Structures are given as structure tokens and as C-alpha cells.
Amino acid sequence: MNKYKYYLFDLDGTISESALGIRESLENAIKSMGKPLPNLDDYTLYIGPPLLDTFRNICRFNEEESARGVEIYREYYNTKGKLVNKLYDGIDRVLAELKNSGAKLAVCSSKYEKFAEEITDLLGVHDMFDAICGSTLDGSRKDKKDLIPYAVERLGGLSLIHISEPTRP
């Protein structure tokens, strides 16, 4: 029997290897705006945080440029970037074991919820989750402090564990 009944999984870097598609989408947005590319070698700087924050902090864009960068990013990501995604080896077995033990599972990602839905479907694990929880276009849910309570509400649970890639020191 599992210690926990509810599990929240991050998507990028936890369930799926998505760094290349995210980087390509980010590079495309920056180049499309005629801006110089920052050093994107450290993917932990831009995989995980909300997109608006990435454009502000990594690219040093102002508010208007950041909003436009997010639009361009999402257009590219929707047609190309999300396809450059693969399930980490063994994660499907882990999800199946948890599900078979009676646990409730949710994706809890700062990625736009529609993309999280589509990606879990593309990866063949969508049906293993009781809820797919992601950010909104209007910014009402954009980071983990907004998303975790939303996921807990969707699952109807209180005793849970959040599984994600390690945070940077």
C-alpha cells in the first residue's frame, strides 16, 4: 500500500524530456523579434518558470516584448515544439503501478493547460491521470503557488506528494 493517495507530477523534465522543443520554441520567438539570443545552455533557467518570467528575466524583454514573445513562442510550440517530446524511460511503468495501487494522479505544470493535455495524449499517458492542471492564458494560474491548490481541488485530496525535477540552489 502506498504512503500517499494523491500524486502531483510536473510535466517538463519529470514525465517527459522536453528541453529541445522548448529551446527551439524560445529561440524561434527571440529570433522572430529580431533580438539577440541569450545563452540558453542552462535549460533549468527557462524550463519550469512561467514563460512571461523567462522572457523578462532571461531575455531581458520589457512587458510588451515579453507578452509578444509568449505569443510567438506558443504559436511555434503548438505546431512544432510540443512534438519534440519523449516520455522518460520507465515513467509509464511508475504511473501504471501507482494507478493500479489506487492512487490518484495529476499533472501539475506551469505549461499552458491545453498543451499539457495534448502532450500527455501524444505521449500515451493521458488516461493515467485523473487531472491535467496547467497555466491559463489570462494569467490567473501561472506558477506552482496557483497550480498546486488547483490540482488538489481537482483531485479532492489533502495528503499528497508533488513530484518534480530538483530545484536550483
Model-inferred region functions:
Residues N2, S101-A103, L155-S159:
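Glycine-rich phosphate-binding loop signature in dinucleotide/nucleotide-binding domains
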Residues N2-L45, C59:
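Active-site neighborhood of HAD-like aspartate-dependent phosphohydrolases
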Residues I22, L51, L87, K144:
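Conserved donor sugar-nucleotide recognition element shared by glycan-biosynthetic enzymes
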